[in-house]
């Protein structure tokens, strides 16, 4: 899968060729999350073909003001994001020319300006005291132009933590889509019922560590028992919520891809899935990533060398190093596996090395 991003947040221009499983390594604040956001942004409008109550775009890309998307707020530039394979392409352009313009696959994205958008599910951005939202009466024509649909997910527990935990402990908040976990987790209860293996796998691991057990109730609530006593949500480790969220996300993406015949057209981005996660869950995480990679593409940000080693032991992983160049822009370079092997360089070594030291181990820098 080829990805090209220009003038998006910290990214002036990068080009990448991603494998079925791609891991982004690099120092903090290098701009790795901006790569995941760009992929989510370019594929966001396909969601209008599948369900109504969509996740807010502004939360996915962490921007309510459209000018936040432009590198250094330079509105003379054009945000350009292209994601695709030989079978499909999503090419998004955002620019200002006598006002805001959005183009997707060379077709104009129909939107309207409002002082206050009446239907919040159509909201895109704000700018200049106005709100921009999709024009529902004209959007069906754009979907026809796109042809075969693409589905992408950006699962980041820390990004949506409050909504995720609230949905798990209090029950389903939003029912759509029924087969695929939302990034904000608001349909967790409905989706998790069709992924019973996740609950079993998590409980099997917990049984080895303690007498803690997870139960999914009929109303979609998650209840965690410690020595047969229901725990208060505030006493439950985030690690339990995180692994449930990530595994249900991956498993549901596999299910949804097969259900809708979307093989090769589904992307799951994982933002630091290992954060605050019990290391004992890593094998399950790798297992679910491997299974989804048979039908779609996985892009992972991680700072954990153990997870990277497990992935590389079991899967053909494409490794990219993400760093800040001399101009302060995000740049990327693919790590050369042969060079890493020759010099006995591990993932842990890379995380502690300076960019100039890592770049000599790369194929080429963008």
Report residues per predicted region:
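Pre-Walker A-like glycine/lysine-rich segment at the N-terminus of P-loop NTPase domains
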Residues: 1-45
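Short amphipathic C-terminal alpha-helix that caps PH/PH-like domains
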Residues: 39, 244-247, 289
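C-terminal lobe/lid and adjacent interdomain/linker elements of RecA-like ASCE P-loop ATPase modules
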Residues: 73, 280-366
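Phosphate-coordinating catalytic segments in nucleotide- and nucleic-acid-processing enzymes
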Residues: 2-4, 44-265, 328-341, 347-366
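Walker B catalytic acidic pair
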Residues: 271-273
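Walker B motif beta-strand of ABC-family P-loop ATPases
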Residues: 267-269
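Conserved D-loop-proximal element of ABC-family nucleotide-binding domains
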Residues: 275-279
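Short loop/turn elements that form and flank the Walker-type P-loop nucleotide-binding site
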Residues: 17-18, 262-264, 293-295
